[in-house]
Amino acid sequence: MALQQVRPTNKQCRKNKKRAKAKMMESPRRLCRWAIISYEGSPRIACNATDETAESPFLRNRERSSCINRGFDISYCVRCAFTPDEHCVWEPCCAIQSVRQQVEVGTSKRTMDIYSPLQFCFRVTGLRVSAVIRLEYVQALFSQPISKVDQVSVGTVTNTITTLSNTIQQSISDKLAILFQSLALLLAAFIIAFKYSWALTLVTSSALLFVVVGCSVTLPFMTKIQQKIDKADEKHSSIAAEVFGSIRTVISLGAQESLSKRYTTWVEEARKRGNGLSLIFGIHFALVFFALYASFSLAFWFGLKLYREGHIGEINTVITVFFSVMIVVSVLGNIASPLIIVSKAASAAGSFFELIDSEKVDSGGLREPDASAHVDIIFRDVRFTYPTRPDVPVLKGLDIRFQNGKTTALVGPSGSGKSTIVALIERWYQLAMSPEDQNQGSIYVGPHDINSLDLKWWRSQIGLVQQEPFLFNDTIFNNVAFGLIGTQWEKEPDSVKKELIEKACREAFAEEFIQRLPEGYATIVGQNGIKLSGGQRQRLAIARSIVKEPKILILDEATSAIDVRGEKIVQAALDRVSRNRTTIMIAHRLSTIRRADHIVVMKGGVNVEEGTHEELLQREGGVYRDLVNAQRLELLAEEDSHTGNAVLELQDEAQSPTMSVQEKLQDEDNTQDKNRGFIRTIGLVLYEQRARWPLYVAVLISTAGAGTAFPLQSWLFAKLIEVFRFTGQKLVDAANFWALMFFLLALAVGVLYSTVGFTANSLSVRISEACRKEYFQNILAKPIPFHDLSENASGSIVSRLATDPKQVQELIGLNGAFPLISTFSMIGCIAIAFSFGWKLSLVTVFAALPCTFLAAFMRIRYELQFEAMNAAVYAGSSQFAAEAIDAFRTVSSLTMEDAILDRYTQLLREQQKKAFRKARYATLIFAFSDSVELCAMALTFWYGGQLLASREYQPTSFFVIFMAIIQGGQSAGQFFSFASNFAQAAASANRILNSRPQSDELGAASIEKQQLVRSGDLTGATVEFHDVSFRYASQDVPLFTGLNVSIQSGQFVAFVGPSGCGKTTVISLLERFYSPSQGTITFNGEDIRTLEMTSYRRELSLVAQEPRLFEGSIRENITLGLDQSEFTEEELIQACKDAEIHDFITSLPEGYATELGIKAQTSLSGGQRQRLCIARALLRKPSLLLLDEATSSLDSQSEKVVQGAMERLAQKRSLTIVAVAHRLATIQKADTIYVFGTAHAGQASRIVEQGTHQELLRAKGTYWQMVSSPRFLT
């Protein structure tokens, strides 16, 4: 509260005179002017200033000189300090008035009533801006052509919507509030300074102009380097997304080390680029803080010069301008760090707007009734190459007509262009509109060019089932209901939708396994449907495509992962829904397309044969006939005699290979996580990086030195006030000396802050690098059940990897250095205050300190809670966005863009509501913490006045203490402004530390394991299952019990059975993804749990049902997980020849060096990817080869060649093969075939038959019924 100015009465003057035991001159026309003067210890009275002399500052100066010449030492004016008179002419009195005025200016800007809504508004604004810009980014991404989306990795998207959006949010919520508040104070200080002396203000501002020029030079460099750092962060986030999105492949290949090196390379690159900021920060802070403190020296020196020359009439003008400059310096010092954060936010915003402002796909056009889907689809001379491989033509003048209401099948070798036709029909790619482009030709839908149709309307007419179906991490009900988007049923109530969904699931043969799930249609399927088997996922995808009764149905290997009985039923359902609608089928299993109205045989990007099944079979030497012959079994069951009675008793197991995996692990994991306090957490991180102690020492010394600048400034200011005791040359000499001292302080501060900027950033990027490497390694070392938990989905992990080390870096860097400076400043201010006057310091410090610490505790505690809430919500929204981008083709084909954006908006809105409620109460805490310093100032000023009035304190002591309290209060305020950074860094550091192996994991790892040593001769492995039982945590019934299997060295063993019966689980147990609940599995006579993991997995090779490739060249993908010394070039080429992929690779312009790009999964066809994975598996020269539907995506010719190569290796006894297959033609030469089944619902799965292909056919049991299915007949 501002002090009121009260003109003293003569009665008050007489009272004061009596107290001083002195005489005072009285006159009706004169005001009371008096001071207690100290001279050689004796109090004296001095009185000066008449109405006449008050008119002239020069007379006052002369009269002042005469007083001093008479022996009076004018030190201070008690009365004017607290009952000020605007006409007072005594310089010390004026100095105290100036102090009071400037305190009023500062305090008026930061009252609780103003600060509370200010902080609240900025926090809410930051949350909303962050949410809106993320939503705009995702929306813009969905509006891009798929050719551009293929160039954006999931890791880049995750990094952008987490790390970069958090930077923007923090900048607005915390730093921008400080910036605007400081700018307002800056403007007020300049207005006051200009009001008192424009000349002095302008000259002083020249030093500040130096700050502006310096910032204009350094900030562009900061932004440029920050953008390079962001690019490096995107790269390592992209690698992390690939790794954790394909974690089973990575672990099975033993590729953790090689992929970690890739990740580490870009982490180190980010550190190197971050080091480039160290020098820029050093220069930036040197220029800024030197100029700021030099402005003190300039203001005082030039002000005294103007005063002596008579251009300034009163010394309080100099003091007022000086204080204004001090406020400006304090403000600019406080915004130095926020300014850097704002520049980072500007760089982050650039990454957002680069995509947001890019050109969008024009989705408008014709729709019903102007256009219709009940027409022919015609390809005319279509030529097409993918943007990622412009030198490799895919379609070469293709002409095809898909007749309305008819079923057209596309068959042919992998890579012949079948899926490309689907992509063009879905308008994921567009043919050229100009003759210069090599993508030429036309696609017509009836009379209309396909590009003239409304994009969303056209896609809503199509039901698509892809070869690798994608399910969202949602319920089964919602996953199927997504197929209703864009139809007349989209807005119907759930009761209506339920009927449609249940009908579609029945037709897709999915209802049977859904009903056996504990939660039925409400079951969460996990990331990409990980909690369901491949066949179950495919059936749900079929249900999703047929639920809307589309006019056009496209089936791209729609039944490849479904078991024999399931495929038969589903195929019959597809045949029914295909009637009277345009259907396009792509298949390698020719039995599924034999009833097609028209079959087109593709080869080399053109159609080489067309006709019906019967017509094509009659062509001697025809391509189609050769494909059919390649799929015949050696011994066929009677074709139709038992078909009608082939009702199997097999039933799908209710639980899938990864159904709600290890839910108890989640509870255990949560109990093991430790929520350490802030000091302990950061202290532990710093302690573990103690090898960097030289940087620690440099940061500590430089921040301590910078922190002493404020206390020294307080002392220097008091000395400057004492200068006014002198006159003449002595005044000039003293003024020049102390101005020089301020200049030397400016030099020292410039050097110290430069050191702070350089060393703090250098330290932070190194510790961040170490934390990020360790974090990645720790999560990569987690077992598969950890990754199966929903909160540990790949998107969430990538989000944490991108954000957590960054938060630690922010705190240990400049955001940690400035609080350190504030801490040392507070300590220094308290120390210097006590040294000049213990009584005033004691009262002020111990009255304010408890409130200060209470406010700090409350604020940091709130920020920790707020950060924990934010982290949980952002992880969910980021995972959702990453999942949607990863499934871009599925989202676009279902026209789910608006639904995805609505759901994403809902997630963000929920987060905003929670944050809004938190912020509403938190701003009161913020206001309280920032008001404590103001209360300390007021208390100091009041109690100091009492001490001055009682003549216990000299003015110098009062000024030093008061200035120290002001500076200490400002330091406390700056310290509190970093509370959010403390909370975020503590939460992030806790997650990093909690990712480390727990005590039980370390105990298990410390047990000595047997190391497997590879011999020179390649021999197969002997594997045995002894009474093995296995149950997932969520299952009441084991998946299987008492499993006994014996696989001899060099044998080819196959497992068949319905989807979900446990076939893939056998593979997972052999790979040690999971451990058996009971029983043992031996490898060459040794329990696999006693074998060292890495050497054991080196003996295995796995080819999964869904092949996974990584960014890099073809060579790098094939040799992934292998050291260069483990294979020769000849062995590499032979493995590719055995996998029937060598010819394709050599046909590419760059051969084995061909880069697969960011989206490696979409750069090749399914069959090409699968053959590369087979080549990768063969190159490892395993003793045990695991095949999980390994040839499901291959055409018949390729499959026959690949199968023959593996059979030859098995015959040589050089490896043992364990295969899981639905396509029985691939396992007819197996030494032993194990047939899984379930006796009754609710019981564990079991092996119902075993034997060779011929033995099982003669037994005419379950296997014979499978073979009797028409899918194996030509």
From Swiss-Prot:
Function recorded in the entry: Pleiotropic ABC efflux transporter that may be involved in A.fumigatus adaptation to azoles such as vorizonazole.
Transmembrane segments: 183-203, 205-225, 280-300, 321-341, 697-717, 737-757, 818-838, 840-860, 924-944
One GO term describing the cellular component: membrane
Protein family membership: Belongs to the ABC transporter superfamily. ABCB family. Multidrug resistance exporter (TC 3.A.1.201) subfamily.
Intracellular or extracellular location(s): Cell membrane
Membrane topology value: Multi-pass membrane protein
Recorded superkingdom: Eukaryota
Induction field: Expression is induced upon voriconazole treatment.
Identification of the protein by name: ABC multidrug transporter E
Gene3D superfamilies: ABC transporter type 1, transmembrane domain, P-loop containing nucleotide triphosphate hydrolases
GO annotation, biological process: transmembrane transport
Entry annotated with the keyword Nucleotide-binding: yes
Domain ABC transporter: 377-629, 1023-1269
ABC transmembrane type-1 domain mapped to chain residues: 120-344, 697-984
GO terms for MF: ABC-type transporter activity; ATP binding; ATP hydrolysis activity; ATPase-coupled transmembrane transporter activity
Keywords from the named record: ATP-binding, Cell membrane, Glycoprotein, Membrane, Nucleotide-binding, Repeat, Transmembrane, Transmembrane helix, Transport
Residues given in the record as ATP binding sites: 412-419, 1057-1064
Pfam families with a match to the protein in the record: ABC_membrane (PF00664), ABC_tran (PF00005)
Gene name for this UniProt entry: abcE
Glycosylation site positions: 48, 473, 580, 792, 1044, 1117
Keyword Glycoprotein: yes
